């Protein structure tokens, strides 16, 4: 760095700046000018200046000497430039650059005791059921695979009569702290212990039943009670039916997601059931009582005289029961008036009499009566 360049100017801070202000300024400039991040001409030299200035100003003793004597008080120990100048950047390891910045700028991983009890993972299971089973509920048997605690070693992974020992390389933490030299100086970062694979323990005599894993994969069979009123895409939770925990931790849960097959007779929206029934022109005109399908069986529906096309009728409490209990939805039935495609002579004469009695007439050149009736009813 040029001999007349002031370290405070390099970092852009005042001479009475606090340690926190100096560190903040350095972090900002180090990221800005780092050669791996900035390929502009002069960035590498600027980066060296920033590190040299920080090497002095963040050290209370060096800073005091600098404030009193200037660069002459450094005796060639001005930090980064003298320490790494001969090496340059070729010897720096940038393979773990993300880890370096994470550790350097406060992103260190939180330590977790690997030998502490850990809850098992949750599992998902998709269960396909019929439309009517979703309405009324049922009990079904399912089978799936999950890990269970080894019954021989009770989850320790060690042969009966032996115990796991604390890893002598990481001291049981499951992590190793590595100190390495980088372009940012000497830094520390954590990595998984390569001896115990992060478990914190060594199993000298693995269990013959689970081969040291502490768990075994087994087929699980359950009787699942499908709640009445369950809908497509909804799920239920079965506590403790998931994967085995570690170090004595509890089992995870099993989540069952329901897929409901569609019905040819009914559709559903929430707690309401929808259906359509056909009736004749005579039934719509004169009125009638008809049988209507519901999810609970056939029921009677009174069709009043003068019923119009697509008129809706509500059948109370013939819908879907609430999952919470206490209420049942309705069924909405839409009537569809069916016009016959052909009629016999007696029917034709009867309809003509009906038209005359109604004060109308049908001219031969006009559209057919049933065609006009269809248009009117559509």
UniProtKB/Swiss-Prot annotation:
Could you tell me which InterPro entries the record lists for this protein?
Answer: DnaJ (IPR012724), DnaJ_C (IPR002939), DnaJ_domain (IPR001623), DnaJ_domain_CS (IPR018253), HSP40/DnaJ_pept-bd (IPR008971), HSP_DnaJ_Cys-rich_dom (IPR001305), HSP_DnaJ_Cys-rich_dom_sf (IPR036410), J_dom_sf (IPR036869)
Q: Zinc finger (CR-type) locations?
A: 137-219
Q: Where is the J domain?
A: 6-70
Provide the binding site for Zn(2+) 1: 150, 153, 207, 210
In Gene Ontology terms, what is a biological process of this protein? protein refolding
From which domain of life does this come? Bacteria
What are the UniProt keywords, alphabetically?
Chaperone, Cytoplasm, DNA replication, Metal-binding, Repeat, Stress response, Zinc, Zinc-finger
Indicate the quaternary assembly. Answer: Homodimer.
What HAMAP family does this protein map onto? DnaJ
Q: Which family does it belong to?
A: Belongs to the DnaJ family.
What's the protein here called? Answer: Chaperone protein DnaJ
